[in-house]
Amino acid sequence: AKPAKRVAVTGAAGQIAYSLL
């Protein structure tokens, strides 16, 4: 579980959630 990968996934999810808002 590389931190960079987790950040990338979180960032993508955040962008999607923001778009839905």
UniProtKB/Swiss-Prot annotation:
GO terms for molecular function: L-malate dehydrogenase (NAD+) activity. Its EC number is 1.1.1.37. It comes from the Bacteria. NAD(+) binds at G11, A12, A13, G14, Q15, I16, A17. GO terms for biological process: tricarboxylic acid cycle. It is an enzyme of class 1 (oxidoreductase). Signal peptide: none annotated. It catalyses: (S)-malate + NAD(+) = oxaloacetate + NADH + H(+). Keywords: NAD, Oxidoreductase, Tricarboxylic acid cycle. The keyword Oxidoreductase applies. The keyword Oxidoreductase applies. Belongs to the LDH/MDH superfamily. MDH type 2 family. Catalyzes the reversible oxidation of malate to oxaloacetate. This is Malate dehydrogenase. It comes from Burkholderia cepacia.
